[in-house]
């Protein structure tokens, strides 16, 4: 006896012009995925994506040379080579021939409807993954590769609970969660100052819903104004006026509510080995199968340009 493939969507389950898929993904509620939407989009060419970082030497006050002296040759410092593994993420759709053919309420094509729905879900999964505390997994024949996420990179300017611990700053070790404590303005100001001292110019504070409300209660430094030309994206924008410039306060539904990030988005990129795409899967019966897929990784161009207040209460 033949049987349906697992998770096939048929008429019993049902209740009720084509664009380039990559454009469809990026046009779906960009404010729902603030990190993915704000990070630079770049290209990866291998499953292990590599890049280089560098830093200026510390400024000194004794750079004085004797008149007519022979030049003293400065030592050159090599760049730092960093890497992150590309992660494959997918969503699949299986629709019976009958379900595609019957007259349906609210949609002409069940396949098109389900693909559009899965595209939104895939983008949300990607935002959740990028902003998580996952450590890189290089993978193998029986193990999926995983990208080192935001929480495994930011170490230079982190504020953790006393029993928390920083990661390795290279994407391959997550930071250790500590005992949760209330989010305070002094923690935020300390991290912003640390980022600025390290050379960063942060523009965004990314928080979950609970700590967005906590931040709104901070002293007179939090203001609100209309976005003007950006009103298509935001009817209003929260701004935190720090001693080192204004930062946009952005709530994120999919990042960890226990983490508050201070981000210089010039130093974060998402490197795509394979951009968002859709494939027809082999037809093995009376059903149509589709796979939506993306393969990408997080590029931390200099983690010292961002900061983290971790181990925050969420209720």
Q: What does each model-identified segment do?
A:
Residues 2-315:
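Flexible, glycine/threonine- and acidic-rich loop/arm segments that mediate assembly and lattice contacts
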């Amino acid at each position: 006896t033949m049987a349906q493939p697992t998770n096939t969507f048929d008429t019993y389950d049902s209740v009720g012009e084509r664009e380039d898929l990559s454009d469809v993904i990026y046009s779906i509620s960009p404010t729902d995925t603030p990190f993915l939407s704000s990070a630079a989009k770049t290209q990866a060419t291998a499953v292990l994506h590599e890049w280089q970082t560098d830093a200026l030497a510390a400024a000194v006050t004794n750079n004085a040379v004797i008149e007519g002296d022979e030049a003293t040759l400065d030592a050159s410092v090599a760049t730092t080579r960093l890497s992150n593994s590309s992660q494959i993420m997918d969503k699949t759709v299986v629709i019976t021939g009958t379900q595609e053919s019957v007259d349906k309420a609210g949609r002409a094509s069940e396949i098109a409807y389900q693909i559009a729905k899965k595209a939104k879900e895939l983008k949300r999964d990607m935002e959740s993954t990028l902003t998580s505390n996952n450590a890189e997994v290089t993978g193998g024949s029986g193990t999926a590769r995983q990208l080192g996420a935001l929480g495994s990179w930011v170490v230079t300017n982190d504020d953790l609970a006393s029993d928390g611990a920083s990661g390795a700053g290279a994407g391959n070790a997550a930071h250790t969660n500590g005992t949760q404590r209330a989010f305070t303005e002094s923690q935020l100001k300390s991290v912003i100052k640390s980022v600025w001292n390290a050379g960063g110019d942060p523009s965004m504070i990314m928080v979950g819903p609970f700590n967005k409300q906590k931040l709104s209660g901070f002293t007179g430094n939090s203001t609100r104004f209309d976005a003007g030309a950006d009103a298509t994206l935001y009817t209003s924008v929260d701004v935190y006026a720090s001693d080192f410039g204004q930062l946009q306060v952005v709530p994120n539904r999919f990042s960890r509510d226990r983490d508050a990030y201070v981000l210089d988005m010039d130093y974060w990129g998402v490197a795509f080995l394979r951009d968002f795409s859709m494939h027809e899967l082999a037809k093995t019966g009376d059903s149509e199968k589709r796979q939506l897929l993306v393969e990408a990784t997080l590029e931390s161009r200099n983690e010292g340009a961002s900061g983290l207040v971790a181990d925050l209460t969420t209720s």
